[in-house]
A protein has these predicted regions:
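Structural signature of the two symmetry-related core transmembrane helices
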Residues: 71-85, 271-285, 364
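Helix-to-loop junctions at the C-terminal end of transmembrane segments
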Residues: 56-68, 153, 256-269, 351
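Intracellular juxtamembrane helix-capping segments at the cytosolic ends
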Residues: 109-122, 309-322
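A late C-terminal transmembrane helix in Major Facilitator Superfamily
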Residues: 324-353
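Helix-loop boundary and gating motifs at the non-cytosolic
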Residues: 2-50, 206-209, 218-235, 242
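Symmetry-related core transmembrane helices of the 12-TM Major Facilitator Superfamily/SLC fold
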Residues: 160-176, 360-375
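C-terminal transmembrane helical hairpin of 12-TM major facilitator-type secondary transporters
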Residues: 270-314
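Residue-level signature of mid-helix packing/kink "hotspots" within the transmembrane helices
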Residues: 50-58, 142-143, 250-258, 340-341
Length: 386
């Protein structure tokens, strides 16, 4: 298998891995709908995957600190490929849910280890840009993946899972040939650390606020991924159009990461955080009130822009403030995973009890509580920079 260098790994691998997963994560709810699944079962797809992810991601990050990054980075796509391959034969909703849990194992050991590997490839002022390149790579797949998945599903419901399995197996062989463990590089030129350390109350207070914001973002995203397809199918929207609509989230995240990567003005700025969450609130209101596809696309763009800031901030501050990068990326992944655990499941409960638009009212309530908590954390401690 051909080898690629470090720069290409950072540019290509997140795209490749997330393309595989985004193909799976649209096709899985659609096939559960075809199997007669209800909204709670749709939500359980995300909840099962994210529960395993949440529990194991922190452990995976810490294990990568001890065992090295390579073994976990290589194992992740292999486990994901096996789960996709088995899904091609699944005939019951229970089978899909069980395999979604196996997916969570692959994601939980891959992402924290790979993020820590990326963080160790640069230090000082280049860290934020390197994380930005990583973020742009995986979100580029979110533009293509849902659209491709919807198209493949329209050909045959099992084709998306064959495609995701093939992509994951190829990635396994590429990583096995290309990735090696490394020691963290020293900061160039004695770069100043503007964000403090884990002993800094101000920096950590802002980090906790960002973690809460990112939890809320992924609570919302979980509902969009696993509950919106049901609302859309009830409105007679085709699978390919659903994929196009969900791709709007990836497009706006990509653009958000692109602009954030080129500036540090948003670092530790409460106004940027609150502004991003105002975008999410606006998008949720649009989904809750209006039925038009163009309005849905606009709402997804607003929410995607918001998520780009909370995700970028959470990952960057986690590896910048915490001394052990595997620990930082593990916590980052576990916290966003907890949002995906609760979001789709609770959204499914209210959708079944009240109606298909109820999950978006629930998301608005969670977002409001999150903002109140963030204001308390960022006001009670002195932030390094306002």
């Amino acid at each position: 298998m051909a080898r690629i260098n470090e720069r290409m790994i950072i540019a290509v691998v997140p795209f490749w891995m997330d393309l595989s997963s985004s193909i799976f994560y649209l096709a899985a709810p659609l096939i559960v709908i075809d199997l007669g699944g209800n909204p709670v079962e749709l939500g359980l797809i995300g909840t099962m995957t994210a529960s395993v992810h949440m529990i194991l991601a922190n452990l995976g990050g810490r294990l990568s600190d001890r065992l090295g990054r390579r073994i976990l980075i290589v194992a992740g796509p292999f486990i994901f490929a096996i789960s996709c391959l088995l899904t091609t034969q699944a005939g019951k909703v229970f089978h899909i849910l069980a395999l979604a849990s196996l997916n969570g194992v692959g994601m939980a050991i891959f992402w924290p280890s790979f993020q820590a590997w990326v963080a160790e490839s640069r230090a000082g002022s280049n860290l934020a840009r390197n994380i930005g390149s990583f973020n742009m790579s995986w979100t580029a797949s979110q533009i293509i993946g849902p659209t491709l998945s919807g198209f493949l599903f329209s050909l045959h419901p099992r084709v998306p899972f064959w495609a995701a399995a093939a992509l994951s197996f190829l990635l396994f062989f590429l990583l096995r040939a290309s990735v090696s463990d490394k020691s963290p590089q020293p900061a160039k030129g004695g770069a100043i650390l503007p964000l403090g350390t884990e002993d800094s109350d101000g920096g950590m207070g802002f980090l906790y606020a960002i973690w809460i914001a990112n939890f809320a973002s992924w609570f919302i995203l979980g509902n969009l991924r696993y509950q919106f397809p049901k609302l859309a199918r009830d409105m007679a929207i085709s699978p390919s159009t659903i994929g196009l609509l969900l791709s709007c989230i990836g497009l706006s995240q990509f653009l958000g990461f692109f602009f954030l990567r080129g500036s540090d003005r948003w670092h530790f700025k409460k106004s940027y955080l609150l502004g991003a969450q105002l975008l999410s609130a606006s998008g949720l209101l649009l989904i809750f009130v209006f039925p038009q596809k163009l309005i849905f696309a606009s709402a997804f763009i607003l929410i995607g822009l918001s998520v780009s800031l909370t995700y970028y901030s959470s990952l960057y501050y986690s590896v910048r403030l915490l001394k052990r990068k595997g620990k930082g990326t593990g916590l980052h992944e576990s916290i966003l995973g907890s949002g995906v655990v609760l979001g789709p499941f609770l959204g499914g409960v209210v959708a079944l009890s009240i109606g298909p638009r109820a999950p978006y009212a629930l998301c608005l309530a969670v977002l409001a509580v999150a903002v109140v908590m963030e204001l308390g954390l960022t006001s009670s401690r002195r932030s390094p920079r306002r």
